[in-house]
Amino acid sequence: MQLVTAAEMQTIDNYTVETIGMPQDVLIERAAMSVIDVIGAGHFNLDHILVLAGLGNNGADGVAISRLLYAQGFNVSLQFVGNVTRAKDSVKHQLDIIEKYGLVHAEKSDFNEATLIIDAIFGTGLNNLLPEGLQKMIKAANHIEKTVIAVDTPTGIDATTGEVRGAALKAHTTVTFGYNKIGLTQRVGGYLSGNVIVKDIGLLTPQDFNFSLPDKENSPSVATS
């Protein structure tokens, strides 16, 4: 199986959007629908779903996921991690959409009430230590051992090295897009990613670049679709 670094994945994302001309909103919707597919195919307790969204494209995926769940009648709460006024335009656009659905994001949610947490805080772009406040929140969430589905990469995991950037949210399942990431198969990242499912959302294939992509044998449980 081909594995990519965070930088290689970013190049693929940029080429797909900027050169090929695939709208970012299309990729976000496909990513969100992929996560919905995984939720529907799994045996998860869906009584109360909490979506934790960051301020970048990973957060935009999370907002779209919350909308799709809400539209299907699920009890879903959306909470932003960070000041939403500083969010990327992709997040703000998704917010405009969910407001028309009548879904309002919460200022703060009780982790204890959630039966399933969707981690859409940070994706593959993380390369620094998480803020101290977020580290504390993650440690608290890990302590109560809730079932977590990570969007693309568990928050706190370096997608290239598998190292923890201060703290990392432990996932039961990680739905990653396009190609599996090296960091989801190595070091503690391989453990904290849980069951990794690779979903095709229409990104450009690495074969179109001069990448030297490593193969990783004996990696953790990985499924593709």
Swiss-Prot record:
Entry EC number(s): 5.1.99.6
Residues recorded as binding K(+), renumbered to this chain, are: 58, 119, 155
Q: Which GO terms describe its molecular function?
A: metal ion binding; mRNA binding; NAD(P)HX epimerase activity; nucleotide binding
What does the record note about the cofactor?
Binds 1 potassium ion per subunit.
GO process terms (BP): deadenylation-independent decapping of nuclear-transcribed mRNA; P-body assembly
Give the EC class as a word: isomerase
Establish whether keyword Nucleotide-binding is in the entry. Answer: yes
Which reactions does this protein catalyse?
A: (6R)-NADHX = (6S)-NADHX; (6R)-NADPHX = (6S)-NADPHX
The cofactors named for this UniProt entry are:
K(+)
Q: Which Pfam families match?
A: YjeF_N (PF03853)
Task: Establish whether keyword Lipid metabolism is in the entry.
Answer: no
GO CC, any one term:
P-body
What function does this protein fulfil?
Answer: Catalyzes the epimerization of the S- and R-forms of NAD(P)HX, a damaged form of NAD(P)H that is a result of enzymatic or heat-dependent hydration. This is a prerequisite for the S-specific NAD(P)H-hydrate dehydratase to allow the repair of both epimers of NAD(P)HX.
The record's HAMAP family line, in alphabetical order, gives: NADHX_epimerase
Q: What is this protein called?
A: NAD(P)H-hydrate epimerase
Q: What is the organism field in this record?
A: Leuconostoc sp. (strain C2)
